């Protein structure tokens, strides 16, 4: 594989995707506030842990109504306008935190900001779907995923350096970077919302999974059983992956003691380095494989990546496991987006993005709590064999879904 072939699919992407790539980097670099919410509430606002936990949960949960609102509006009005309006409102409510005197108001301003932040997500996903086709979506989604991770690799580091002495700059920086990303979209990306004539033509003429549909989100979603089952199975993936954020640091603190947080930070650095430097290579190597088979492969990498932690007592093994599950993360994130969009009607892209994001996100929401119950009863080490089995099961179920979907399409083709 030569260098030219690595970037072949990316070079062919439309200009608008590269604009979104740079906008994604800028937006992610400036995500200073929400990753530090727990520290901000406890150290700066002096809330106790219970009160801080409530407000963190509130800000997280606030994205759900935002997703539903943004998904609905993105399918009715121009996607670009919806993204610009909600992103701007999200930024302004973060900036408003600098203007209030009473600290009790700040968590509510951040919660409102989270609602609008959630609302811009379906519009962004719908725009990417509109601007791409099944042939170039693998490259497009992997590029945007790379942009997000480049930003997140830089942003928290800057925030950590500025937090103690220049906290106000974090609120200003978060606001400014969001507005810059909005300006990039406003000036350089054309509206992508499907016109009425193309929707009518799609209803009559198209036969694929992206065919325009009439009816409620629930009827249309349930009429795509393969996408429904994909979403349910992929929820297991999110439960497996959340162990990297919850159980892994607990395990490392137990093994390495006071050095645990430092080593966990190194693990997160390895994760970021692998994503930044290997995403293009991995996607180029797997681009000819069907998206759903790639997602099945990702679960196997999860299985061995997290499973090896059961035997890990040295940092080297933790580093090796991180490389494995990060490769799974790259493949799962990119190709799940591709599969979902390829099975989403053009009339429901915003709403599908919202509802599927919420369903899959339940693994991240309930995963830490269920893992905590397991750890309390059986110990932290015992969870890794369970995670290994769950990942293998997820891979098998995903492959079964591919088998039945492929057989169904073959039957329809020759009937």
Could you describe each region identified by the protein language model?
Residues 1-14, 192-230:
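Juxtamembrane intracellular "pre-TM" segments in multi-pass secondary transporters
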Residues 10-60, 226-233, 237-258, 263:
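Helix-loop boundary and gating motifs at the non-cytosolic
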Residues 25, 104-119, 317-331:
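Hydrophobic core of transmembrane alpha-helices in multi-pass small-molecule transporters
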Residues 32, 60-68, 152-153, 272-280, ...:
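Residue-level signature of mid-helix packing/kink "hotspots" within the transmembrane helices
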Residues 66-78, 278-290:
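Helix-to-loop junctions at the C-terminal end of transmembrane segments
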Residues 81-95, 293-307:
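Structural signature of the two symmetry-related core transmembrane helices
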Residues 111-148:
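Cytoplasmic helix-loop-helix junction between adjacent transmembrane helices
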Residues 164-176, 373-391:
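A membrane-interface helix-boundary motif in multi-pass transporters
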């Amino acid at each position: 594989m030569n260098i030219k072939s690595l970037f072949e699919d990316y070079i062919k992407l439309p200009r608008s995707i590269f604009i979104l790539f740079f906008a994604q980097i800028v937006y992610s670099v400036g995500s200073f506030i929400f990753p530090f919410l727990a520290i901000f509430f406890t150290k700066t606002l002096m809330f106790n842990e219970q009160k801080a936990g409530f407000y963190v949960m509130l800000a997280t949960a606030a994205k759900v109504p935002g997703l539903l609102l943004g998904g609905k509006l993105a399918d009715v009005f121009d996607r670009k306008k919806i993204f610009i309006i909600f992103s701007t409102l999200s930024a302004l409510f973060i900036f408003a935190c600098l203007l209030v005197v009473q600290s009790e108001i700040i968590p509510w301003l951040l919660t409102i900001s989270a609602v609008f932040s959630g609302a811009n997500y379906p519009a962004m996903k719908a725009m990417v779907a509109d601007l791409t086709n099944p042939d170039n979506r693998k490259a497009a989604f992997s590029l945007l995923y790379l942009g997000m991770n480049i930003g997140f690799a830089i942003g928290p580091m800057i925030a950590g350096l500025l937090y103690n002495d220049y906290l106000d700059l974090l609120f200003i920086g978060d606001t400014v970077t969001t507005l810059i990303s909005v300006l990039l979209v406003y000036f350089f990306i054309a509206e992508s919302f499907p016109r009425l004539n193309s929707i009518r033509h799609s209803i009559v003429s198209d036969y694929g999974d992206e065919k325009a549909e009439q009816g409620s989100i629930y009827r249309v979603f349930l009429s795509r059983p393969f996408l429904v089952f994909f979403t349910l199975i992929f929820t297991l993936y999110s439960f497996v992956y959340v162990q990297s954020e919850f159980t892994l640091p607990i395990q490392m603190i137990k093994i390495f003691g006071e050095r645990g947080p430092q080593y966990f930070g190194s693990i997160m650095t390895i994760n970021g380095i692998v994503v930044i430097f290997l995403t293009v290579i991995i996607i180029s190597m797997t681009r000819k494989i069907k998206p759903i088979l790639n997602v099945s492969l990702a679960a196997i990498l999860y299985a061995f990546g997290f499973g090896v932690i059961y035997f890990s007592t040295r940092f080297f093994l933790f580093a090796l496991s991180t490389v494995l599950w990060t490769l799974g993360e790259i493949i799962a994130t990119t190709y799940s987006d591709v599969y979902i969009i390829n099975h989403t009607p053009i009339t429901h892209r915003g709403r599908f993005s919202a509802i599927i994001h919420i369903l899959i996100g339940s693994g991240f929401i309930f995963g830490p709590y269920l893992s905590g119950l397991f750890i309390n009863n059986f110990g932290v080490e015992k969870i890794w064999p369970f995670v290994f089995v769950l990942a293998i099961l997820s891979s098998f179920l995903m492959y079964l879904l591919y088998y039945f979907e492929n057989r169904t399409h073959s039957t329809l083709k020759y009937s």
